[in-house]
Amino acid sequence: MNIGQRYGWEFALAVLLVMEILLFGIANPRMLDINILLFSTSDFICIGIVALPLTMVIVSGGIDISFGSTIGLCAISLGVMNQADIPMAAAIPLTLNVGAMCGIINAALILYTGVNPLVITLGTLYLFGGSALLLSGIFGATGYEGIGGFPQAFTDFANLTLLGLPVPLAMFIICVLVFWLFMHRTHSGRNIFLIGQNNKAAYYTAIPVARTLYFIYSLTGIAAAIAAIVLVSYFGSARSDLGSSFLMPAITAVVLGGANIYGGSGSIIGTALAMLLIGYLQQGLQMIGIPNQISSALSGALLIIAVVGRSISLHRHQIRGWMQRRRNQKLPS
């Protein structure tokens, strides 16, 4: 398989991303300002951080829809630890452990009950979300009020730059590189594809299915914790609803990026490009004055068009053969 065939979809997404930015730039020249392009990513890049390990979960044939609640629980946990005067140097690693535990709980329930991952993670979505609300209520932040009082150095973190890039964007780029190397250049990463293609065959060929699932679900939890830390720093307060709007954009990015929702195929680079495509679509529509409701509908339409286009691309030989047979049937004998 040559490079064009292997990375054709990623190349198409990159072209669409450039075209999208140029079109919005024609409508509003501010969209072509490099500073706006870079710093506007802070509004949506945390979705991408979670979407990267979610790609591995979906490639394995699973799904995790609880990560939004995991973000809320991790955010509240960080706020509670800050209120308890635990230093941020200790609170941040503990928050990452909370995220990892959420992922481990998901994997354990999926493996030992045999229930569909969608059903399990739907249950843990409410479990983690309810726990976040309970914690915030116990510590005085009723409803969706935030827990504030974070150190100035911490709240400044999300607004810092690294090599000219906003810190959240720099973290996303690092995550893309790490996850791409793991998924596409290691034996363990290839196991994820094999599990998604045929779970039973993976068991019989001695692939460590359980260990792999524990690992990728815990990675999703850790990514949710990282997103929570960045969001709390960005907004200056910890709220239980911080990840409530992440579900559909993240899954859309994974599917638009080329992942098969039934497992077996997917691309980290594709997910990253799709996340930027979706994020800049929302930003661009807002900059030209389109209401959020319409921009959400257009995002959904983009997903449908992309999925149909991807399906046609994957099955073009079958479609061409079917059309040829139809033409032959119409020819006079």
From Swiss-Prot:
One matching Pfam family: BPD_transp_2
Keywords: Cell inner membrane, Cell membrane, Membrane, Transmembrane, Transmembrane helix, Transport
Record-linked InterPro entries: ABC_transp_permease
Keyword RNA-binding: no
Regions crossing the membrane: 7-27, 45-65, 70-90, 91-111, 119-139, 162-182, 212-232, 240-260, 261-281, 288-308
Subunit structure: The complex is composed of two ATP-binding proteins (LsrA), two transmembrane proteins (LsrC and LsrD) and a solute-binding protein (LsrB).
Protein family according to the UniProt entry: Belongs to the binding-protein-dependent transport system permease family. AraH/RbsC subfamily.
Name listed for the protein in its UniProt record: Autoinducer 2 import system permease protein LsrD
Species this protein is from: Photorhabdus temperata
